[in-house]
Amino acid sequence: MLPPPPRQPPPQARAARGAVRLQRPFLRSPLGVLRLLQLLAGAAFWITIATSKYQGPVHFALFVSVLFWLLTLGLYFLTLLGKHELVPVLGSRWLMVNVAHDVLAAALYGAATGIMSDQMQRHSYCNLKDYPLPCAYHAFLAAAVCGGVCHGLYLLSALYGCGRRCQGKQEVA
């Protein structure tokens, strides 16, 4: 024999207390767009270096590009999902963390761009039309351009964050 049907419907499940919500204003903000461009240019930078034959100081440029690509990816998703307040000690100062990250990234990308420009000049001998051996000149040229773009993008986002801070705002977007 079947039990009688319930008189009341079962209670609705509550949304999880720490539910993840997409922060749509961040996607449309200048910093959100800059972060996406930084991720694209940074990926182009380190993929260009990684696919060429490199040695010596180029290892530093590759380290800088991969490190800041991963850090930028983390900052982007923590801000996009609104979970930056869960980061111990730094979550309450999220705008300043972003500015410090951008200033450091701009400085180190500037150094990496200088390294790639130097390597490009050192390999300029093989930039001849009929040079028969493989040459990393074009890869280093592309990496130097991508590094300069990354440097500029991080500098822009640092200036944007400083401007927001000077206006008295505490939030990234």
Swiss-Prot record:
It comes from Homo sapiens. The keyword Cytoplasm applies. This is MARVEL domain-containing protein 1. Down-regulated in primary multiple tumors derived from ovary, vulva, uterus, cervix, breast, testis, kidney bladder and liver. The reduced expression is owing to DNA methylation and could be reversed by pharmacologic demethylation. The lineage of its organism: Eukaryota, Metazoa, Chordata, Craniata, Vertebrata. GO terms for molecular function: structural constituent of myelin sheath. It comes from the Eukaryota. The chain crosses the membrane at residues 30-50, 60-80, 95-115, 139-159. Keywords: Acetylation, Cell cycle, Cell membrane, Cytoplasm, Cytoskeleton, Membrane, Nucleus, Transmembrane, Transmembrane helix. Widely expressed in normal tissues. Down-regulated in multiple primary tumors. Pfam families: MARVEL (PF01284). The modification N-acetylmethionine is found at residue 1. PANTHER family: MARVEL DOMAIN-CONTAINING PROTEIN 1, MARVEL-CONTAINING POTENTIAL LIPID RAFT-ASSOCIATED PROTEIN. Residues 51-59, 116-138 are extracellular. It is a multi-pass membrane protein. The gene is MARVELD1.
